[in-house]
Amino acid sequence: LSAKSQGGRIVLRIEDLDAERCPRVYADLLEQDLAWLGLTWDEGGSTGGAHAPYYQSECGDIYTQSYRKLEQKGLVYPCFCSRSQLHAASAPHTSDGNVIYPGTCRGLTPEEIAEKRKKKAPAYRLMVPDEAITFTDGCMGTHTENLLRDCGDFYLRRADGVFAYQLAVVVDDARMGVTEVVRGADLLSSTARQLYLYRLLGLQPPRF
């Protein structure tokens, strides 16, 4: 309603980064449910538009370009930690229940990385500074999060090559010209990380 009242356009983006877990039939059912509710959109997978592709599973090459920019800044490093290892270490958790990464692999030497690669493929994390980011959400007010203490170095890419949600949504919002994002409270804790990515990539963030 906010977008329509201001002459904006609604983009239906399908966030199916993990194509195996999110088969296309789920997206089809989603569109059917939205249509049943009387909700319409101007651009999307079934309708087309100027900002295709609308399925994140088809955007790997686009995400790679931004990922390479972060690599060139020296902020990306390989991580060999498993989820079970992080939980076993009793690492602190974020407000959404995720483990705050303690930086276990942040300081690995080239020799240590080469040795660990012999046993398993790494995921890749973005190094974050000890910096507080304050933002105002249109529904939930002003919030402040410290990137290092409240979020920790976060995933950009899984070991199987699938890009992480945080990077994908930032790149997609920018390339689609998204100016306003409405989301649930469960995604509030993602905002500081996304704002940091917008800054690193030189992109204009939307209003939340």
Predicted regions and their residues:
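N-terminal Rossmann-like or analogous alpha/beta NTP/dinucleotide-binding catalytic cores
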Residues: 1-90, 94, 185-205
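Active-site cores that bind ATP or allylic diphosphates and position pyrophosphate for catalysis
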Residues: 78, 83-207
